[in-house]
């Protein structure tokens, strides 16, 4: 765990393809346009998504990868690279708990190490009330991961959105979008 206070958020997903990169790029662009110094990061060794991040933020995005950076150096690296930022936005890799054996290098492991709150992106296409079980499962799977809310992606209609928001309320899961 970290002892520092530095504004940061992780945008994670239930799996690849749920819209993490699109959402993170939108957030980076928004904060940059509003005059905030936003520092992007990507969990893992990906070099494509950081290119999108850099375009939106106006400067480099960095990888947070405990395969390449020893875990005991990760906090030090994060602090150094985010020192001039008003907020850091970290895009997760694959699904929140996916990584190497025992979750090494997973987004969840990075979130716990950096003591970073997590916003979980849910793909709501072709699902209604059952999406609450998915969100609840992710929240309960590891209580050390601080899932602070969700972003609902690929909603089919206003009615669909209302249904999903209602069921998220039943499990006390904040919806950010």
Name what the model sees in each region:
Residues 2-18, 22, 28-114, 122-149, ...:
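ATP-dependent carboxylate-amine ligase catalytic core
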